[in-house]
Curated annotation (Swiss-Prot):
It comes from the Bacteria. Its main location: periplasm. This is Flagellar P-ring protein. NCBIfam families: PRK05303.1. Belongs to the FlgI family. GO terms for biological process: bacterial-type flagellum-dependent cell motility. InterPro entries: Flag_FlgI (IPR001782). Pfam families: FlgI (PF02119). Keywords: Bacterial flagellum, Periplasm, Signal. The gene is flgI. It is found in: Periplasm; Bacterial flagellum basal body.
Length: 372
């Protein structure tokens, strides 16, 4: 049994099972699209984590940590002479990032992620001092502070030896920031609601317009492009929310996904869509394996000969070529048939990647081949 191809066979079997033809199911608009303008916004900030057990920044290599601490102490009324550079090991300079959810209001908490930006070994047990979080416009939208939760562990010895488990230089603070400024209201002063599909598809857009018109009356919705549907709505915010509550629960059958094969060249993962078809083609695929082994020979001179012991390496190179087997795809071959044919010849994931690329180059693969 070829164990190397077993994970691929299990994956292929699972994909083939999912590809069994089934009637199209109705999906809600809220699962297919998002309301235009309703999105999160990235926040970023800089701060200091204190209280570390000797695992903080080595300040001789990260002078900005000392400078930041001096500035902080100065704001608190503690003056540190300019010619004094404390050698600290319990402080770390960190970057803070978070996402400001849509409709977040002042006073609401949000989660934050804290990451070391210098040479701290671990942030475990540290506390983040108050730091502002800014948006892309430079405005402060939240203030962050709190005790870190770190899933990893790290320690370093004086001789430079180091041990770490997971990633101890990154931590999170649940509800670690408080919103101080709200985003502008996206619903103010507009007579239309924009719906943007998660995936570009003209069929789904057309069906969405028809479903909305069927539920709310003809002319309520119009297609803008392959992603966007515009819906007429009242200008009163309360009425708009009521319309959206009904609108997002309207059901429709989305269009079929385009035929696509996605290949991860690094891991050998291959995902084949249900609608992939292959034109008539014959394929022969073999592989060449080169094995290099190294042995060491020791030559010991005779007693009292005055010679020296010599160590010589000995390399053995062996090349084996597996016999290739040819198989044939008829016109209109489906996903299930592709998987069965590849499994019969015992192809590994890497072999399947090469076969699919060759089929695409030959014009026999009627699908988009995407390599990630």
């Amino acid at each position: 049994m070829n164990l190397s191809s077993l994970p691929f066979r299990l994956l292929a079997a699972a994909v083939a099972l999912c590809a069994i033809a089934a009637p199209a199911s109705a999906e809600r608009i809220k699962d297919l699209a998002q309301v235009g303008g309703v999105r999160g916004n990235a926040l970023v900030g800089y701060g200091l984590v204190v209280g570390l057990d000797g695992s903080g920044d080595r300040t001789s290599q990260a002078p900005f940590t000392v400078q930041s601490l001096k500035n902080l102490l100065g704001e608190l009324g503690v003056n540190v002479p300019a010619n004094v550079n404390p050698q600290l090991k319990n402080v770390a300079a960190v970057a803070i990032h978070a996402e400001l959810p849509p409709f977040a209001k002042p006073g609401q908490p949000i989660d934050i992620t804290v990451s070391s930006i210098a040479n701290a070994v671990s942030l475990r047990g540290g506390s983040l001092l108050m730091a502002p979080l800014k948006g892309a416009d430079g405005q402060v939208y939240a203030m962050a502070q709190g005790n870190l939760v770190v899933g990893g562990f790290g320690a370093q010895g004086k001789d430079g030896s180091r041990v770490s488990v997971n990633i101890p230089s990154v931590g999170r603070i649940p509800n670690g920031a408080t919103v101080e400024r709200a985003l502008p209201d996206v619903f103010a002063g507009s007579g239309e609601i924009t719906l943007n599909l998660h995936q570009n598809d003209f069929t789904t857009v057309s069906r969405m317009v028809a479903a909305i018109d069927n539920s709310f009356g003809a002319g309520t919705a119009r297609a803008v492009d392959g992603v966007t549907v515009s819906v007429r709505s009242p200008t009163d915010p309360s009425a708009r929310i009521g319309l959206l509550a009904r609108l997002e629960n309207v059901e429709l059958s989305p269009g079929d996904a385009p035929a696509k094969v996605v290949v991860n060249a690094r891991t050998g993962t291959v995902v084949i869509g249900q609608l992939v078809r292959v034109m008539p083609a014959a394929i022969a695929h073999g592989s060449l394996t080169v094995t290099i082994s190294e042995n060491t020979n020791v030559s010991q001179p005779g007693a009292f000969s005055g010679g020296r012991t010599a160590v010589t390496p000995q390399s053995t190179i062996k090349a084996t070529s597996e016999g290739s087997r040819m198989f044939k795809f008829e016109g209109g071959t489906t996903l299930d048939q592709i998987v069965r044919a590849v499994n019969e010849v015992g192809a590994a994931p890497g072999d399947l990647v090469a076969i699919l690329e060759a089929l695409k180059q030959a014009g026999a693969l009627t699908a988009e081949l995407e390599v990630i």
